[in-house]
Amino acid sequence: MGAPEPSWCFLFLPVLLTVGGLSPVQAQSDNYPGCECSSVSPGVLAGIVLGDLVLTLLIALAVYSLGRLVSRGRGTADGTRKQHMAETESPYQELQGQRPEVYSDLNTQRQYYR
């Protein structure tokens, strides 16, 4: 099978420290002898990590399910809107040939504003 990937090695580190009789928090506090920090047991630390993973998965599942519900609702509204637009006339006016009287009318109005 080969050696585990580097990310898996970090997951085994707390287990190895616990088997060795040293919790991960105690290993860090040994580096700072003046620190009077309360130690966290490995069970509490594992509970925090697992709880975080479970909550993250629940949030992802909720976002996914809500996303599917919203897209279904929009799909039906778009379908009826497209059918309604097909039944009515086009909102655009068709182009007609050049009409010089429109432009000549604009030129006469411009003289009044000068």
Curated annotation (Swiss-Prot):
TM stretches of this protein: 43-63
Compartments where found: Cell membrane
Membrane topology category: Single-pass type I membrane protein
Cleaved signal peptide residues: 1-27
Binding positions for Ca(2+) per the UniProt entry: 52
Residues annotated with Phosphotyrosine modification: 92, 103
PANTHER family: TYRO PROTEIN TYROSINE KINASE-BINDING PROTEIN
Family membership noted in the UniProt record: Belongs to the TYROBP family.
Protein name: TYRO protein tyrosine kinase-binding protein
Encoding gene (name): Tyrobp
